[in-house]
Every structure is written in C-alpha cells, then in structure tokens.
Amino acid sequence: MNKKIFNKSGIAIDFGATKISVSQIIKGKFKKTITEPTSINKIANNYIQQIEKNIKNLNISKSKKIGIAITGRVDQYGNWYPVNKENLGNFKIPLKKLIEKKFNTASTIINDATAAALGEANYGKGYQYKRLGYIT
C-alpha cells in the first residue's frame, strides 16, 4: 500500500447531484466536515459560492491543495459537464480554473466514481489484486 497519501493535508470535496461535503484533511485524517444539500439552481457560479461558503464555515484560511470528486464528466483540463441535468443544469464549467483562481491554490478535479475506484485500487482492499472492477 502506498503510505505517502496518509501524510497529506488539504481540502477534500465530494460534490454530488443531491449533496456536497467539504472536509479538512490534516496528515491524512479527516478533521472537520460539513455536508449539506447541493444548491439546485443550475447556475454554475452558485456552485463555486457554495464550496467557498463551506470552506469558510470550516474556518480554513489557506490550503496547499483542493481535491474534488464530482458527479458527471470531467475532461483532461478540469472542465465539468454535469450529467444530472434535472438537478445541476446543462453546461460546461471550467471548474479547475475557477477553483484555482478563487482559492489561489492547486486543485485536482475527478469524476466521483473514478475517484472511488482509484482509491480502492491503490489504498483499499483492491490493492492486493492485479485487476479491479468497481460498480457504483
């Protein structure tokens, strides 16, 4: 198992169609988490504001890294394309660029199911296997 990750600190965000969780991670441990319903207004900038509000509510002043696992498609440039158009709208949002500009820090944006599969394969029970299938 790759132990390097367990010394990492930053902000982890789980952004789904119905809920958003923002967590502060210090040396690989979840210290504080806020979870609330996702704002269902289909306006891209409001999602950024919701993330910002939750980070402020956790009293986090600065972080070297923000990681976001998000529902929908994410391209290689960090652009987000929601697939749940009923709740999230139908648009392309340059999420990586907006997050990095807003918080002046590096970010990683990845599809939530991909994040779960990679986490399980590299750090969970799947680590011991050569191949892994993952169903959400």
Predicted regions and their residues:
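Short, Lys/Arg-enriched, disordered terminal segments
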Residues: 1-9, 56-57, 61
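Solvent-exposed alpha-helices and their adjacent loops that cap or buttress functional pockets
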Residues: 2-5, 124-128, 135-136
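Short glycine-rich, Thr/Ser-proximal phosphate-binding strand/loop in the N-terminal lobe
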Residues: 5-46, 81-82
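Short glycine-aspartate micro-motif
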Residues: 8-14, 65-67, 131-136
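Short glycine-rich anion-binding loops that position phosphate/pyrophosphate groups of nucleotides
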Residues: 18, 71-74
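Short coil-to-beta-strand
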Residues: 25, 63-68
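Glycine-rich phosphate-binding loop and adjoining helix at the ATP-binding site
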Residues: 39-52, 64-66, 74-131
